[in-house]
Regions:
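Alpha/beta-hydrolase fold nucleophile elbow
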Residues: 1-7
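A conserved short beta-strand
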Residues: 3, 23-33
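Short glycine-enriched nucleophile-adjacent loop
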Residues: 11-22
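A short beta-to-alpha transition loop/helix N-cap that caps and shapes the active-site region
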Residues: 34-39, 57-58
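Short beta-strand/loop motif that positions the catalytic acidic residue
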Residues: 43, 48-51
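Acidic catalytic loop of the alpha/beta-hydrolase fold
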Residues: 54-59, 86
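Short alpha-helix in the alpha/beta-hydrolase fold that links the catalytic acid
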Residues: 59-69
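C-terminal catalytic histidine-bearing segment of alpha/beta-hydrolase fold enzymes
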Residues: 70-113
Length: 113
């Protein structure tokens, strides 16, 4: 079975891969761009979505994405980490990295798989 994890641009690619192929059985997207409603309707993989609370550009697409996943009957989990910035899991970026949120999100990701 195939699963994928992506961060930022890579998170958006996980969303697109899930829409493009039934081969993906599980996907985890960290603060990636949401697919269109048409793309989301094609997703069959289980999905886990992680978002930063302080990420208006990415988060503006989340409600429509989640509604499309629900309408398509996709099993998904979505988490918003309040008070953290986009790229909160990137420990090479001290201005954005949040160790507590990163550890929680990664633990959830490992548990998901």
């Amino acid at each position: 079975q195939v699963g994928a994890v992506g961060f930022c641009w890579g998170g958006g690619m996980v969303n697109r891969l899930a829409a493009a192929s039934d081969a993906l059985k599980a996907g985890v997207c960290y603060y990636g761009r949401s697919p269109t409603a048409e793309e989301a309707a094609k997703i069959r993989a289980r999905m886990m979505l992680h978002y930063a609370g302080n990420d208006a550009r990415i988060n503006e697409g989340v409600p429509a994405y989640e509604a499309a996943l629900k309408a398509a009957g996709v099993r998904f989990q979505s988490y918003v980490y309040e008070g953290v910035e986009h790229a909160f899991n990137n420990d090479a970026n001290a201005a954005r990295y949040n160790a507590e949120a990163a550890a929680l999100a990664w633990g959830r990701t490992i548990g998901f798989f």
